[in-house]
Structures are given as structure tokens and as C-alpha cells.
Amino acid sequence: MHNEANNKQDNEIMRAAIVGSRDFNDYNMLVEYIYNICIENNYSITEIVSGGARGADKLGEQFANNYNLKLTVFKADWNKYGKRAGFVRNVDIIKNCDICFAFWDGESHGTKHDIDLCKDYNKKCYIKLFKNKG
């Protein structure tokens, strides 16, 4: 994010994955959560890594566009991998980020997989639990 966090010295430059449940749609929550973590930790995000799915992934892409950040999207190759495609894509996302922001409803298996992959690859994962309205 090119904002106050970028004006501090000794920022840690980061590629950030933004992942989460497909029914997550609160862009303001996403921005506020990421912004606060970046300020608290002196992070300077230069690139967003996404999986291209609806929900949190698409909001992450919007975030990248709004803040003029580089965007890398790893789409699932359903023809090549079949039902495993989402999980294969998740590995690509986590391998290609420095930190991860996961917006999780507490149920999504794909988001849980991302969180677990962060542990496997020793990547810092910030998890924001949310409840759907309605």
C-alpha cells in the first residue's frame, strides 16, 4: 500500500496474498484490516497475489487496482487438475507471497487450505474471521 506505511523507513517490502471465502464481500473491512496490519508491522505491500475466484480474491484484485499495486493472479486449471485444481492453485499462491491475509467464514475448505499452507511454507498468515450478514 502506498500510504503512510510506505513513508516510514526500514519498511519490509512484501508480496501479499489476499485469499478467502467466496462469499466474502466487505471491501471496507478488507482495506481497514490490511491497512491496520501494515501500519502496526511497518509492512510495505508492493504486490497482491490472488487466485482469481469470486469473493475475497476479487476484492484483493480490486485492492491492487485501487492502490496501483502489481497484481499476480493464479487461476485454477480445472481441465488439467479436475477437482484438485483449487488446491494446486492455492500452493502457487502461497509459494509466491511473503504474507497472507485470509478472510475466512470458519467453514471454507479452500481458505483453510491456504491457512494450513502458510504454516507448511512458514509464511505469516493474518486471519480475519467474518460472519455473513443475513
Positions of predicted regions on the chain:
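Acidic/glycine-enriched connector segments
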Residues: 4, 13, 23-134
